[in-house]
Amino acid sequence: MAAAFVFVACHNSGKEDHTGHPSNEPKTQEDSLMAEVMDGHEVGMSKSKKLEDMQAKVKAALDSISKLPAKAQQQLAPYKIQLDSAASGLSYAVYAMDKWMEEFNMDSAKDNIEARIKYLTDEKMKVGKVKEAILNSLATADSLLRAKL
């Protein structure tokens, strides 16, 4: 989590150019790739609380179903399966973000531009998949919880 704080604290997504400070506009392919990687990271971090809240809501819904009479549980079995799947999706999204943050090395191959470009291209793809997992799992869980039964 400390790495996440550093990423968020050190990355300014604004494009203003203050006197004496360099502009945040990407100037090279490396800069552009790093900006795209950080954008993916920021989307993930901005949804971390929502992931946590949604996990709690899905768990509460599953707990509520488990307390119903057997006949009602049987009627809600297909919905419970969907909720279980949504819970797994949310858990995976959290896991994927944590794993990506642990493994990401902001300074990887700084002295070898070709290796750096390849590394950042790969990381852009990875963080894109993480972002997709986060957004899709949140949308799925949200639509299930809003469903009228």
Where do the PLM segments sit?
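C-terminal motif of bacterial Sec signal peptides marking the signal peptidase cleavage site
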Residues: V6-A9
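Intrinsically disordered, glycine/charged-rich N-terminal periplasmic/extracytoplasmic linker segments
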Residues: K47-L149
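Immediate post-signal-peptide N-terminus of mature secreted/exported proteins
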Residues: N12-S64
